[in-house]
Amino acid sequence: MAASSDTGLDVTGGCLCGAVRYHAHTVNREGYYCHCRMCQLAFGNTRAAFFNLPKASVRWQGEPRYFRSSKFARRAFCGNCGTPLSFEYLESKHMDLSGGSLDEPSLLTPTSHFAIEKRVPNWHADDGLPGTRLDEHVKLTERWTQNYGSDVGVAAARET
């Protein structure tokens, strides 16, 4: 269910088994695809679909479980069925909810790709959307390098 207004969009979503639900308010209808190796493993897919919104706008019904995927980030999921629900940097006021967990995923439109150097070529269809390499996100790359060396992703998740 969704309600739209000039100031944004109210959306609902949750996990496969229904134990964890959310209601959220987003100010835009834009989503993105992440191709980083960590998201590939967390979602069991070649990419993850997300939309970004303020953490304060998300209300959970049922408690998600959290996996600390690095020293500075965590991922919410359903402890019963395992559905990936969100990604967030611990200190950020924003978070990403998974596009596939929306009750109406078609309400949002993907507008870009992130971590395009990690795209799996034989699983990628060129949709014409712009893409960003991880190393173009300087602050994130510096943070990863300081904490984990050159491995951007998998070692961090397996260390925590």
Give the label of every model feature segment:
Residues A2-G14, A19-T160:
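A short Gly-Trp-Pro
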